Amino acid sequence: MSKITVSTLNKMKAEKNKITALTAYDASFAKLFHDNGVEVILVGDSLGMVLQGGDDTLGVTNQDIAYHTRCVRAGSRELFVIADMPFMTYSSPNDTCKNAAELMRAGANMVKLEGGEWLFESIEALTQQGIPVCGHLGLTPQSVHVFGGFKVQGRAEEQALKIIADAKALEAAGAQLLVLECIPSALAKRVTDALTIPTIGIGAGNTTDGQILVMHDLVGISAGFIPKFSKNFLLETGNMPEAVKKYCTDVKSGAFPSAEHEFK
């Protein structure tokens, strides 16, 4: 696999070649994913739940993400690595740039921030400093207490229009990628069609430019609640490498996610 860059992802969108992404937190899984077709790894603050056992992602620190980013980068020099910026690490442009720099030094190719138009100045500042940005709209887990739980967003037209407006604002500020989480598939298509930057969906149907899953959901080892949008590929294939290959193949072909995994 040749080195994946922002230009690679833009070309994939233009050619309608679906982007495959998974979360990872260590070198072994990064290498496994690299060897079996994954193009993007997210070092997600989801580690607060799947690794640290928390009820949400709010306890994750910038140092946690930096540590796991270094581990992931050690497993692959070619994969495109996105590092999540944890809760309250991007409350001002200055804080955002300082904390993002730590993640870039740890080996990230891009940082991800949750939120809409209010992030404009911070994203602009990051872009001016040469730090690529991924936005995140829809169900943004760091706002779980505002939403009253992990709930589908954007079903009401007013909400949908706000998400579309936020997406356009993030792109205008300089964001080069956008994650759409737990929104109706029809809305995900509207957002994807409205942007020139690639979109990556999780619980957003199969009309986005790519897909991402939490690796624990991919192999069916999630504790407790199993999201509607997840699929246990290990159950279907019997071993980890084949599970990853099957995920990538199904994303590329459009077989995953299917109608049973999307929200209306």
Curated annotation (Swiss-Prot):
Domain of life from the UniProt record: Bacteria
Positions that bind Mg(2+): D45, D84, E114
Pathway(s) the chain acts in: Cofactor biosynthesis; (R)-pantothenate biosynthesis; (R)-pantoate from 3-methyl-2-oxobutanoate: step 1/2
Main subcellular location of this protein, as a coarse class: cytoplasm
Principal EC category: transferase
Protein residues bound to 3-methyl-2-oxobutanoate: D45, S46, D84, K112
Subcellular location: Cytoplasm
KW Transferase (keyword) present: yes
Location of the active site: E181 (proton acceptor)
Reactions the enzyme catalyzes: 3-methyl-2-oxobutanoate + (6R)-5,10-methylene-5,6,7,8-tetrahydrofolate + H2O = 2-dehydropantoate + (6S)-5,6,7,8-tetrahydrofolate
Cofactor(s) for this UniProt protein: Mg(2+)
Cofactor note: Binds 1 Mg(2+) ion per subunit.
Gene3D superfamilies on file: Phosphoenolpyruvate-binding domains (3.20.20.60)
Biological-process GO terms, alphabetical: pantothenate biosynthetic process
EC number(s) reported in the record: 2.1.2.11
Alphabetical keyword list: Cytoplasm, Magnesium, Metal-binding, Pantothenate biosynthesis, Transferase
Family assignment from sequence similarity: Belongs to the PanB family.
Function description: Catalyzes the reversible reaction in which hydroxymethyl group from 5,10-methylenetetrahydrofolate is transferred onto alpha-ketoisovalerate to form ketopantoate.
Protein name: 3-methyl-2-oxobutanoate hydroxymethyltransferase
Source organism of this protein record: Pseudoalteromonas translucida (strain TAC 125)
Top-level taxonomy: Bacteria, Pseudomonadati, Pseudomonadota, Gammaproteobacteria, Alteromonadales
